[in-house]
């Protein structure tokens, strides 16, 4: 048996630069991890089946599950003769902008690499993972990073300053492809990637909070105004900075002090079913 942890990610910044010839957007984003985790265990099987065990109403256990697809890809790539049972204990909210599915897929690639003693490098696993998901290369490493291209080009950055994170997911799901289709690249939106990069370089917490920016946020807010209300609620309750992560709908707030973080947590706990008080990892 092999055990892997799959932490959630949040975006400090997210920008889309142009539409690529392959139909995807060229993206530029700075991401880090928080200590909200899915936990996965892996067992070899005597047959060649891939079995995903998960108790969650909204997460499939078939080929639509990214962990299943990662296992399928891994077994094909390394021509394995055995299948695997993957058990997922899910804590990361689903369709939330926190890369829960990608984190599980990345953990699956790392886990099978160990389970079958393949000895592939993390770089090799990241390249493999990029075939099925843009956030998977980042999730292979679980380090604070600037990600460009489709997300597969990674530059590691300093860990962020120590802080509390209040994560709140409104009671709705958002499809990332649907949000990306609505991007208007002619419309100006300032994303502070350089400011965030420098803030991490200098471990400047205040500058980090000022740099939080996401081009997808106004698009998701136009469809779901409660995202903006939630963000404003966090800021009014004392968050040093707040932002929607990914394509949403999860909003997070940053706080330096635990008492401050608990105030924000209590302020938003009544309006969302899924609220978490966690720490930055990076």
Curated annotation (Swiss-Prot):
Active site residues according to the UniProt entry: 9, 135
GO terms for biological process, alphabetical: terpenoid biosynthetic process
EC number per UniProt: 2.7.1.148
Alphabetic keyword roster: ATP-binding, Kinase, Nucleotide-binding, Transferase
EC category name: transferase
Alphabetical list of Gene3D superfamilies matching this protein: 3.30.230.10, GHMP kinase, C-terminal domain (3.30.70.890)
Residues annotated for ATP binding in this entry: 93-103
GO molecular function per UniProt: 4-(cytidine 5'-diphospho)-2-C-methyl-D-erythritol kinase activity; ATP binding
Catalyzed chemical reaction(s): 4-CDP-2-C-methyl-D-erythritol + ATP = 4-CDP-2-C-methyl-D-erythritol 2-phosphate + ADP + H(+)
Similarity field: Belongs to the GHMP kinase family. IspE subfamily.
Matches recorded under NCBIfam families: ispE
Protein task: Catalyzes the phosphorylation of the position 2 hydroxy group of 4-diphosphocytidyl-2C-methyl-D-erythritol.
Protein name: Putative 4-diphosphocytidyl-2-C-methyl-D-erythritol kinase
Species whose genome carries this gene: Staphylococcus aureus (strain bovine RF122 / ET3-1)
